[in-house]
Every structure is written in C-alpha cells, then in structure tokens.
C-alpha cells in the first residue's frame, strides 16, 4: 500500500511539474512615435517636397524578430521579442516626422505611388546595423543618398 501511495505521489508531482512549466510568451514592440508637427496648409505648400523612400535594411534585419549581437561575430534574431509592425516602415515614418520637426526647408513625405513624385527631391536611407549589443548599447549604422 505504501508503495502505491508513493508511486501515486511521484506521478502526481511529475505531472504537475510538467504542466506548470513556464510558457514563454512573446512580446511585440514599436518604436516611439515622434511628436507631430502642426503647420498651416499654406506653410506646407511653400516648401518643396522631400520624398523619403522606404528604408532599405540589411537582409538579416528585414524580419520581425529583434536582432541582438551576442559577441563580436555573432548575431541572433529573437523568436519571442518581435517588431509589431515592419521595422523598415516604422523607421521611415520616424524619419519623416523627425525631419518635419528639425528642419524647415523641405516638407518631408513618404513615397506614394498614387502621386507623381518624379520631379521631387528624394532621400534614400540604408541601414546595415540596427540592433542591440551584448555591451548594452544599440548599434545603428548606415548611409543616405539624396537625388
């Protein structure tokens, strides 16, 4: 009888341990939004348009998983910590908002295939790095081209 009792307890504890194992929940992240700029339509109309093309990301960044560098030579892409929305689109929107805030010569706008923007000035950003680091820093590296 004792043997059956101890076997039952062991089985119960074993099954309870398996069923209460922590389940990893994923988290979704967005970049912080920039403050919107409020200008009159006449102020906007006086500025030449600057078309901000979608940011081009290095291939290892162009996915939903947040990228983290674990050593000088290794990067990993998170499975449970992901971007809630395309990081390329988020960065493009943030660049447009920041340029509207921090300069007054152009009126930055996102590329729009429904409008003829062929004669407008254009800005193309490319990011080779946009990741966290094992040193506790964020790494951002890239370039820009204007037309």
Report residues per predicted region.
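N-terminal segment of the mature soluble domain
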Residues: 47-115
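N-terminal secretory signal peptides
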Residues: 33-53
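Bacterial N-terminal signal peptides that target proteins for export
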Residues: 1-6
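C-terminal motif of bacterial Sec signal peptides marking the signal peptidase cleavage site
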Residues: 14-17
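Surface-exposed short loop/turn segments
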Residues: 20-39, 102-147
